[in-house]
A protein has these predicted regions:
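Membrane-proximal, glycine/serine-rich, low-complexity loop/turn segments characteristic
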Residues: 5-10, 14-233, 243-278, 305, ...
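Surface-exposed extracellular loop regions of Gram-negative outer-membrane beta-barrel proteins
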Residues: 105-127, 229, 273-279, 284, ...
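C-terminal beta-barrel architecture of Gram-negative outer-membrane proteins
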Residues: 141, 520-527, 542-585, 589-617
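Outer-membrane beta-barrel translocator domains and adjoining extracellular loop/strand segments
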Residues: 164-179, 224-240, 256, 282-291, ...
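Outer-membrane beta-barrel transmembrane domain signature of Gram-negative proteins
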Residues: 249, 284, 288-368, 380, ...
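Outer membrane beta-barrel strand-and-loop segments of large Gram-negative receptors
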Residues: 304-306, 352, 439, 443, ...
Length: 662
């Protein structure tokens, strides 16, 4: 976009698609980046923002500190919402690497600003088919604009069917008087999943407000998740036996969401969001080992309610003050039958409150201070109410060297709540040596993070260097202990984790047609105490985009990884990944085909852990992680005046508190 000019605080910046504003980076897509993108994720990927990792295949957007929150015109968005964005309807993108105002509290924020229309409509169709195994993703949508109002209907169907995950596993269980060894080899695996969704949405937008109402329905069914395995036992007893593990799941979730953003005055805004959902989950597992049979059947009803309100006022000298109140509530009832009969009723609620103050100090310094608290409550029907108060704080200090360079330091304090599927008093049979058990008395996890970063936009080069230290107190992790002749797998919250991390991120624009992005990461993780686990790893990735007329070619790759899973306390080693794609874009058509790991037949995912009484190593392979290909076709037909493509802000995840075995 060599010819584009951007006016910023009375300074015109020419030829730059990255513009550093007071509290965020304004990213202006050029024609090449827009033309060769089919979705909102494609466009974000093409922008090659140095500190962002965008997986356009899975819709995951993250930065070094964690997952990035996505917004469209200031409204919080989910995967489908961004996936359904039409790139040519996007004016620009705001990247809040140090979120302030309504975005305060996020690790980082992306806000898509779209071109709004007042008449016309569209019909869109898109489909993606994987080559190498069965996976299809098909969507249809329509939108009608009339004045300040818009109405949309979106629907989709996703199906997967492949040979499942095959495992080779060695285990050692150290009982007081003897040791048992077990080798597991998968002989057959089958997996099938189907998902459907429907969304109805009405929106009214004026200069004073943006309000919407949305009704959604999600159905997610896994009719087949089967594994047949050969078990070889040695040590105390020596024998071989076959096992079969069959699981079925079915979830249905309707939800209603109301959203309103109000410009009270030119300097004051108020945002309110309320969402409620009901979920019906069914889970069945049958495990056989020789003539022994284990059965679990669970019916669950889950109610969820989320409410948030944000107020922000702009003060003099580019300062601002805001407040944020949130409450998240879940109530679940599960009826277990089979090996263990039980009724589990749990409610969990977390209330959070924050103040946010942003202060400019002279021309070079700025500070963002966000103090607050979390009040977490949960109660299992057989236990007393658990209550945890936590201090939360985000503070960022920025020194602006010049318009293209910054130094930044941050100190953050937070907390993390346990997953609702951990909080129960249930026992579940894993196999006839192991039991999985819930724990309703888990502590509140505390997070402490200190970071420093240098960021620069230097002509064609954009880069970032940063270092981060993180300490996690009362980390929730897997716990193993012996009970009679069984190994019990449960949960604990009395261990700490320390992370020392460093990163180099850069992107370079060789020409209008050729762009590249490079990331390098260093991770050093320590889990002191009982197990004294340490791991070091270096990870690098490279992405290259080349544009020529209506064609775009992408090549990407990342090195093998080694990381400690802070929940399982296992060291996980993942293989290198590489791939390429070519796309053709013309008017309303976007056609893309690609391949991942085209020269790799046997990608293996390795995992191992050593505990005082239980050690294991595991290698997993799956058809979906070997060499595969895909073809994706999208077409949009506009009628009347062209309109922005509707954004499906459905959350297609289905919540569940059911404790399941792997």
């Amino acid at each position: 976009m060599e010819s584009d000019n951007v006016i910023l605080n009375e300074v015109v910046v020419k030829g730059s698609s990255y513009v550093r504003k007071t509290d965020h980076v304004l990213v202006i897509p050029d024609k090449q980046q827009v033309k060769h993108a089919g979705t909102g994720y494609d466009l974000l990927y093409n922008l090659m923002i140095p500190s962002l990792e965008v997986n356009k295949r899975t819709g995951k957007v993250s930065t070094f500190g964690g997952e990035v929150a996505l917004y469209i015109n200031g409204e919080k968005a989910e995967y489908e919402e961004v996936q359904n964005l039409r790139p040519r309807d996007i004016k620009n993108i705001e990247y809040y690497d140090t979120p302030t105002g309504k975005y305060a509290g996020d690790v980082a924020s992306i806000n898509y600003i779209t071109k709004e229309r007042t008449s016309g409509g569209y019909v869109s169709l898109d489909g993606k088919q994987t080559i190498g195994y069965l996976m299809g993703n098909y969507n249809i949508g329509t939108k009608l604009m009339h004045g300040n109002n818009s109405y949309s209907v979106l629907g989709g169907y996703i199906t997967q069917k492949y040979d499942g995950v095959k495992t080779s596993k060695n285990e050692e269980i150290l009982f007081p008087e003897y040791t048992t060894h077990r080798n597991t080899q998968t002989t057959q695996a089958d997996y099938q999943n189907n998902q459907q969704y429907l969304q109805l949405k009405a929106n009214n937008r004026t200069e004073k407000h943006n309000i919407s109402a949305q009704l959604s329905l999600v159905h997610n069914e896994t009719p087949k998740n089967n594994n047949s395995e050969l078990l070889d036992y040695s040590g105390h007893h020596t024998y071989s036996i076959s096992s079969a593990n069959q699981k079925k799941e079915d979830g249905l979730s309707p939800s209603v969401k109301l959203y309103g953003n109000f410009n009270i005055t030119p300097k004051q805004t108020l945002e309110v969001t309320a969402k409620t959902a009901y979920t019906q989950n069914d889970y069945t597992r049958t495990y056989t080992e020789g003539e022994n049979i284990s059965l679990t059947d669970v019916d669950e009803e889950l109610y969820a309610f989320d409410f948030s309100t944000r107020y922000n006022i702009k003060l003099e000298h580019n300062n601002s003050l805001g407040a944020n109140l949130q409450h998240h509530h879940k109530v679940t009832s599960s009826s277990y039958t089979g090996d263990y009969d039980s009724w589990q009723h749990l409610w969990m609620g977390e209330t959070m409150f924050f103040l946010n103050y942003n202060q400019r100090i002279a021309k070079k310094f700025s500070m963002n201070f966000l103090p607050g608290f979390s009040w977490l409550n949960y109660k299992l029907h057989t236990d007393a109410r658990q209550q945890h108060w936590s201090l939360r704080m985000n503070s960022t200090f920025i020194y602006t060297i010049n318009k293209s360079q910054q130094l930044m330091a941050s100190v953050d304090i937070g907390n993390d709540q346990p997953d609702i599927s951990y909080i129960n008093s249930m026992d579940q049979t894993v196999d006839f040596l192991q039991i999985k058990r819930g724990n309703p008395h888990l502590d509140n996890t505390k997070l402490y993070v200190v970071g420093i970063a240098y960021k620069a936009q230097l002509n064609r080069l954009n880069f970032q260097i940063l270092g981060v230290y993180q300490k996690i107190q009362n980390n929730i992790s897997t716990d193993y202990y012996l009970e009679n002749d069984k190994l019990v797998s449960s949960f604990r919250s009395d261990m700490d984790v320390e992370h020392w991390n460093a990163a180099l991120d850069l992107s370079y624009r060789f020409s209008d047609n050729l762009r590249a992005k490079f990331n390098a990461r260093y991770y050093h993780t320590i889990i002191p105490g009982e197990y004294n686990i340490t791991d070091n790893s270096v990870i690098a990735s490279l992405d290259i985009n080349y544009y020529w007329k209506n064609l775009a070619i992408n090549v990407y790759g990342s090195t093998a990884t080694s990381r400690i899973n802070r929940f399982s306390l296992a060291i996980e080693k993942n293989p290198a990944i590489y791939g390429t794609s070519i796309s053709w874009s013309h008017k309303g058509w976007h056609v893309e085909t690609g391949t991942e790991n085209p020269f790799t037949k046997h990608n293996r995912y390795r995992e191992y852990a050593n505990f005082s009484i239980y050690n294991y190593s595991r290698i997993q392979t799956s058809r979906i992680n070997q060499r595969t290909g895909y073809i994706k076709i999208a077409y949009t037909f506009d009628f009347g005046q062209k309109t922005s493509r509707e954004k499906s802000d459905m959350d297609r995840n289905i919540n569940s508190a059911i404790m399941k075995t792997n």
